[in-house]
């Protein structure tokens, strides 16, 4: 029959409403892993910038599967993760209505790239942020120690304020991203001492994550602007001869109640939503100073993770990086929060040991043929432009 039956599942998921633009380009982290005080103090999240995607080849290690010990080709995302700088500590107390901020202690010196975060127009400002606060350290520091003692005495959750070193990335933006990251492990006193010792110091990504670990990626998705109801909700197109348009919803509700219900599919914003993508396996935690961070035990070619010509619309990666399986929310250059998994992963895929055989470093602009400039020169010879 050409018409619809009397019943059918609704189009689109109502669990992600309202579908509106995110309040900030850096997505909020609404939950952190459960604290285990028997472990050493460590960060639970890290900040990075999405650089792009590439392809890898590896041998599948899954006994019992038809593809065990066979080569598989998978897509991976590379996230540029320069070391973050610890600039503050926040203590939270538990109340009947949830966590409440007790107090915040900042470091004595803050770089200009994070001070820009507190100004709308840095160029025309007097740049006096935190000058009065820094004077507390110059006097005797008793007030600072008093606030740290309050956190040790009353707080039940300790989080540190960290900011990215955006100047180390290829991005033109000069304003660093600032975020709160929870500290897990150890007692409250040990957490506060850890934060105090790391004031104005950097923390590398390899001290937070390791290979084969399962993590979550939290970011704002790519924006697509105002979109029609058919593409936004996946509703069915109307018949060809329908009056006044086909890509619409024919009936948007009953006569009464005399308003449009919130659950009815309508046109509006699509994309630029805050989303959390869970259970991404880390395939590699690379070092920025390693000139062969794109090589493997099978492919001994000396090459970096950056493809020829750089990642499209991003550039060259000169810092530490993380390679995760699959795609993550956001477009290139987008700030991404990488968080330890909230759950204990026991699946075979999560526990599998990953050993990469080959990483594609051909140009991502067009159909790349060569993995390194040396390989291109050996095939093409001396070009006229190089004479």
Swiss-Prot record:
GO terms for biological process: cytoplasmic translation; maintenance of translational fidelity; ribosomal large subunit assembly; rRNA processing; translation; translational elongation. One of its GO terms (molecular function) is RNA binding. Its main location: cytoplasm. Signal peptide: none annotated. The modification Phosphothreonine is found at residue 103. There is a cross-link at residues 39, 136 (Glycyl lysine isopeptide (Lys-Gly) (interchain with G-Cter in ubiquitin)). The modification Phosphoserine is found at residues 24, 156, 297. It is found in: Cytoplasm. Keywords: Cytoplasm, Isopeptide bond, Methylation, Phosphoprotein, Ribonucleoprotein, Ribosomal protein, Ubl conjugation. One of its GO terms (cellular component) is cytoplasm. Disruption phenotype: A mutant confers resistance to trichodermin, a trichotecene toxin produced by plant-pathogenic fungi. Methylation at His-243 by HPM1 is required for proper 60S subunit assembly and promotes translational elongation fidelity. The keyword Ubl conjugation applies. SUPFAM superfamilies: Translation proteins. Pfam families: Ribosomal_L3. Belongs to the universal ribosomal protein uL3 family. Component of the ribosome, a large ribonucleoprotein complex responsible for the synthesis of proteins in the cell. The small ribosomal subunit (SSU) binds messenger RNAs (mRNAs) and translates the encoded message by selecting cognate aminoacyl-transfer RNA (tRNA) molecules. The large subunit (LSU) contains the ribosomal catalytic site termed the peptidyl transferase center (PTC), which catalyzes the formation of peptide bonds, thereby polymerizing the amino acids delivered by tRNAs into a polypeptide chain. Present with 450 molecules/cell in log phase SD medium. This is Large ribosomal subunit protein uL3. It comes from Saccharomyces cerevisiae (strain ATCC 204508 / S288c) (Baker's yeast).
